[in-house]
Amino acid sequence: SLFSETRGPALKGIVEELSQVRYLGQLVVSLSGSAEANEFQEMRALFKNFECLDGAPATVIWSDGPRVQALLGQLRAEGLDPGSDGKGRATWLAYGYVLATQQARVVATHDCDILGYKRELLARLCYPTANPNMNYEFAKGYYGRVTDRLHGRVTRLFMMPLLRSMKSVLGPIPLLEYLESFRYPLAGECSMTTDLIRANRIPADWGLEVGVLAEVFRNSALKRICQVELTENYDHKHQELSENDPRHGLHRMVVDIASSIIRNLASYGVEFEAGFLNTMISAYVRTAQDAIASYSNDAKLNGLSFDRHSEEVAVETFSSALRGAGLNFVRDPMGAPQIPNWSRVISALPDFLNELREAVEKDAQDAS
């Protein structure tokens, strides 16, 4: 969670709904992008009345707390880069804290900016992995993104057209078939077992959702992976396109997502060079333009607002982001490393999980 979300309506609604849930053994909130102790205190205050099954309070991890930062520095000194501050690292820290406390077998993750949140969403997300009779290790959520218009631009106009165009250029590749099988591959909502949490490496940036799916593909059997509809419709904080600045907004998000897809495909033997990138981008643009025409028809049929020009601008921005991600890969195939999985961290630093738990708790005490 970002501190700015404490001021919005979404998080308060989520807390109210979660306070009525009676099956949670643990609630962990990972706060990133907040260096001030008073901001950390404000986030904790939102959860002050929440109680888990055994009466324990919610845990808020202050990612910028001095002791947590010292531990991250210790990882860097060991050659284990935890990445920069962001959604991926915040999620990774929360997973580490859950492993350290040894209370959970299944962990559900979702964002803190969901508008109109209902506790049924969490129940549906947890059930496939929590029910031992179902034998699933990983569940991915999906939902509709419609109000008076179609939302989910990155999924509609980038992710799905890119996967389809890559299949047309490269032919059937198991990883592409797998990624395309998800109804909403960029959904932030998923649940998984702690065994997978130990094994998965994840990106520190906006490539988190794609990176997690790729790691689950690598570390789990397909028959133990499922997807579940969480709600009929879903709304959250909308980001600006930022067409002229790849460092912000959806533009940056698409650069990170494209980088994650390219690097994961390369790890399965796909070669990326300048000529292939040009072909891939051309195929993507054509497929995305066809998608715009289809969405225009959907909007007309259902009486929705549809700005075709803004959709075309989005595709142009996303194609620029794809080119940037591809050229970055050609220049530096390794790129920014993924955060090491928890199995490797524990192997290198056997006491790290206990130290993380202690750091989280002491940072919270000192900030009080």
What is the predicted role of each segment?
Residues 101-117:
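Short beta-strand-to-loop acidic/aromatic patch adjacent to the donor-nucleotide binding site
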Residues 204, 214-233:
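Catalytic donor-sugar/metal-binding loop of nucleotide-sugar-dependent glycosyltransferases
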Residues 13-25, 34, 49, 130:
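Short, acidic, metal-binding catalytic loop of nucleotide-sugar glycosyltransferases
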Residues 146-153, 170-189:
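A recurrent flexible, glycine/aromatic-enriched loop bordering the glycosyltransferase active site
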Residues 240-368:
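Terminal low-complexity segments of carbohydrate-biosynthetic enzymes
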Residues 38-102:
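Active-site-proximal specificity loops/subdomain of glycosyltransferases
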Residues 115-144:
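Conserved donor-nucleotide/metal-binding helix-loop-beta segment in metal-dependent transferases, i.e.
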Residues 226-247:
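Active-site donor/metal-binding and catalytic loop motifs
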